[in-house]
Swiss-Prot record:
The PRC barrel domain binds ribosomal protein uS19. This is Ribosome maturation factor RimM. Residues 98-170 form the PRC barrel domain. GO terms for biological process: ribosomal small subunit biogenesis; rRNA processing. Belongs to the RimM family. Its main location: cytoplasm. InterPro entries: PRC_barrel-like_sf, PRC_RimM, RimM, RimM_N, RimM_N_sf, Transl_B-barrel_sf. It comes from Pediococcus pentosaceus (strain ATCC 25745 / CCUG 21536 / LMG 10740 / 183-1w). NCBIfam families: 16S_RimM. Keywords: Chaperone, Cytoplasm, Ribosome biogenesis, rRNA processing. The lineage of its organism: Bacteria, Bacillati, Bacillota, Bacilli, Lactobacillales. It holds the Pfam family PRC_RimM. It is found in: Cytoplasm.
Length: 171
């Protein structure tokens, strides 16, 4: 079964079992709604969840979320989860509009410029206002491409390719 990151549990809050989480999802209103089921993993790379939990309630708070889980009413119930990752199963992913995609769908796609394959997407970095796509190139250093409409021209998931225009100086 495939799981996808939703948030990182960064701390507890108060004594009543609240968790402070940093959201990784574009759909926090869906992921943290009352009754939503989430899986807790020790690390992002783990393949088996530590526990499956149900959201009791959540609220946005200073750029993060305060989440309470069903059946966990004290700090003693949740303290063990600090530093762990919240994930959802693949079948819980939202349907996207045409032309939209999940980042995990582009990892491994061929990168094409002027009908020539220049590499494959290795990872996506999300540090600033734009994501940066890391392109693994044969016998060269990785290429860092900002996710801008003038650089990333087309993403074709069916063909497994991304059309790009590499600006001068980035090569």
């Amino acid at each position: 079964m495939n799981y996808f990151n939703v948030a990182k549990i960064v701390n507890t809050r108060g004594l009543r079992g609240e968790l402070k989480v940093i959201s990784y999802t574009d759909f926090p209103e869906e992921r943290f709604k009352s009754g939503a089921e989430l899986q807790i993993f020790k690390t992002e790379k783990d393949e088996v969840p530590v526990q499956t939990v149900t959201v009791k309630n959540a609220k946005e708070y200073k750029g993060s979320f305060i989440v309470t889980l069903e059946g966990m009413n004290s700090i003693n119930d949740v303290e063990k989860f600090k530093g762990m990752i919240l994930k959802v199963e693949e079948d819980q992913l939202q349907d996207l509009e045409e032309g939209e995609f999940y980042l995990h769908q582009i990892i491994g796609l061929d990168v094409i410029e002027n009908d020539q394959k220049i590499g494959t997407i290795k990872e996506v970095l999300s540090y600033g206002p734009n994501d940066v796509w890391v392109v693994k190139r044969p016998n060269q250093n990785d290429l860092l491409l900002p996710y801008l409409k003038d650089v990333i021209l087309n993403v074709d998931l069916e063909q497994g390719a991304v059309q790009v225009s590499v600006p001068e100086g980035l090569d």
